């Protein structure tokens, strides 16, 4: 494997795993709360986008990036509505 491909595949593997964990958890949570399928799917996709960058976000915040998988599951469990409301409250936009 070339020297260019190996780091790229490592990044994609890690981000893909985190995104998949957030997606699955969000989809399970939404279906458990009996939300309709398309709303559940959209919520899960948005959580997957956040979960995919959990590793970099933890590094940016100065935290240990080894917990990015746990952070991705937490993102999926909380959902984008709750995370968005929390961010609005923290920034004073609510």
Curated annotation (Swiss-Prot):
Record keyword Transferase present: no
Pfam families: Phage_holin_3_1
GO biological process, alphabetically ordered: killing of cells of another organism
Sorted UniProt keywords: Cytolysis, Host cell lysis by virus, Viral release from host cell
InterPro entries xref list: Phage_lambda_GpS_holin
UniProt family annotation: Belongs to the lambda phage S protein family.
Function noted in UniProt: Essential for lysis of the bacterial cell wall by disrupting the cell membrane, thereby giving hydrolytic enzymes access to the cell wall.
The name this protein goes by in its record: Putative lysis protein S
Source organism phylogeny: Viruses, Duplodnaviria, Heunggongvirae, Uroviricota, Caudoviricetes
Gene designation: 11
């Amino acid at each position: 494997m070339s020297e260019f491909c190996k780091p790229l595949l490592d990044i994609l593997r890690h981000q893909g795993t985190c995104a998949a964990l957030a997606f699955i958890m969000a989809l399970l949570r939404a279906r458990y709360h009996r939300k309709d399928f398309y709303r559940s799917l959209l919520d899960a996709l948005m959580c997957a986008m956040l979960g995919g960058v959990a590793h970099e976000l933890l590094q940016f915040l100065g935290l240990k990036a080894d917990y990015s998988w746990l952070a991705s599951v937490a993102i999926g469990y909380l959902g984008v509505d709750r995370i968005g409301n929390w961010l609005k409250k923290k920034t004073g936009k609510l």
